[in-house]
Amino acid sequence: MPGFNYGGKGDGTGWSSERGSGPEPGGGSHGNSGGHDRGDSSNVGNESVTVMKPGDSYNTPWGKVIINAAGQPTMNGTVMTADNSSMVPYGRGFTRVLNSLVNNPVSPAGQNGGKSPVQTAVENYLMVQSGNLPPGYWLSNGKVMTEVREERTSGGGGKNGNERTWTVKVPREVPQLTASYNEGMRIRQEAADRARAEANARALAEEEARAIASGKSKAEFDAGKRVEAAQAAINTAQLNVNNLSGAVSAANQVITQKQAEMTPLKNELAAANQRVQETLKFINDPIRSRIHFNMRSGLIRAQHNVDTKQNEINAAVANRDALNSQLSQANNILQNARNEKSAADAALSAATAQRLQAEAALRAAAEAAEKARQRQAEEAERQRQAMEVAEKAKDERELLEKTSELIAGMGDKIGEHLGDKYKAIAKDIADNIKNFQGKTIRSFDDAMASLNKITANPAMKINKADRDALVNAWKHVDAQDMANKLGNLSKAFKVADVVMKVEKVREKSIEGYETGNWGPLMLEVESWVLSGIASSVALGIFSATLGAYALSLGVPAIAVGIAGILLAAVVGALIDDKFADALNNEIIRPAH
């Protein structure tokens, strides 16, 4: 990216201004623009520029100018061209600014299409650096040329002389534009080289990534590339050997042919020599000596032919020997390439074996890790299940203990009406509930057999007033409220589940009081167990529901006593048959 100096004092701001050292700039023919007697150089070579390299930058009031990798000026990420930007005065010089940011573009300044000489020089510099030559410039032997006007003078001098002056156009190099052109070529070549190197690197990286993605290791990929290079070297060396072998064969054929051509020449030489020997006797004969000299000339020609042919043979042999030497070198190169190929193959095999070994080790490690993970998972699951069992057991114990307390409390309250023996039976039932964990409730048939002992007792006949009072008490039970209260007994069940169970117990209890059929109530408890609820939990929920109902009763004492006996009978029937007998023998008959 160019800077410039038009000869002013300069403000030292780099490319956008100038670092001048000359006198103040002048106008017309004054200043450093040249004398009137040596012509107009069209502002060529008079303004100096400073080359900025890719990556250089400077600040202007309109934004930061950055030279990109291609040597182009950019502002706000946009490459500035003659179409989208203008030369704007800045300091004591000019700088290029995007048109969209310029409020007042540079006004015309004389010649050059309204542009100042400095502005024109900078734009020419930019254009040439981009590889384009402005009108009036051309390239000659790597130099940027243009035409300049020069004055020529002829004739005599003095006051009365006939001196004549005229102007001619002559070609002249513009060194600064030549440097700009070469700099642009260098920048573009470097950019092309970088792009090519980056493309090759990307291609190699993509190939390597594909190879690794297919399962190859980095070492295996590198070894494979080495094998490819070695094979290419073998192919080249083999082609060279083949060519040289053909050349040696051709040289041997030439030698054979020339040796064959030598035979008649030697025969001719021998014949010529024979003729010379035969004419030696004429050498002193003035008349016939001419014959000898003619034969002698033929001998010389024959010897020359033999020598020439021998030289050709020697040259052919030397050529063959040279080719053999080259062939030997080529064979050595070929052998070296084959050795390299063997080494590369070995390296590839080793890398492949190493990869396979590593993969096997990885698989073994993965399998071991998976087995360890499975063992850990199994152990964690065992621990979780054990904790869950322990937690359930804890919840069940908590439920049974609190239910036991509830039943004991119910026994104390109802015992106020039925006496201490009822309290003792209720306490026995409460203790059985407390220790019921791990046990199972009695079957429906067995439980009903025990319960029927109570309901069949004539003394357990319930009059209508008491029945209505007990049924009405059940009808006023709020299942949600009771479930919320029972929910505090244990985490063994959810309140939502208890609501449904309380509702079922309420419905079946009402049915029992109204019809005297307590089978549906007993079947309800059995259905809980069949659905997966532990017997202890089922007994706890059932007993707690009935106990909470009994504790909430505000009915006459006789009705409370009936409810207490039926509660003990129903709950006790699920635990042991003895409670039915105790109720019949110790509570019901004495009470009625």
UniProtKB/Swiss-Prot annotation:
One of its GO terms (cellular component) is plasma membrane. One of its GO terms (molecular function) is molecular adaptor activity. Residues 1-57, 373-395 are annotated as: Disordered. Its main location: membrane. The chain crosses the membrane at residues 528-548, 555-575. Disulfide bonds: none annotated. This is Colicin-A. The gene is caa.
